[in-house]
Amino acid sequence: SLDKIKNTIKDFQSAKQFDDWLMAVGKSSGDNLRSICVEENHVRGCTTNVWIKGNKIKEKWYFGFYSNTMFTNGVVSIVCEGCNGLTANQVAQIKYTDFDWLGGNLTLNKKKGLQAMLNHIKNIAKTWLYSI
């Protein structure tokens, strides 16, 4: 859960410890979802290529992702984890500041990427919300 992740990060003593942990998260997540690497799933605003696809199951959203860099995979994994299992209205309520605990450890470019990932997820849910 996100609370467990927050508590893990809170205990880190250095930026290197955070980076190493995020790389490990990235390495262990993101099953090989190359099949989602199509234009409509591509996240604009990230310095590395990232694709996120949403699937709605019984009114709740679940997000899959693909990136070919471990660090980015770690970030997108955590962002998707924070949005998985939410309704479209709940996804719409998520703010960048909900991830301050993660963003505080990122460079400016990576923070922009985090915002772009979150915007992409929100747009997926919003598009569905306005289509009903």
Predicted regions, residues:
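C-terminal binding/interaction regions
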Residues: 67, 89-94, 99-132
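Hydrophobic/aromatic-rich, well-ordered segments within soluble, folded domains that form packed cores
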Residues: 70-91
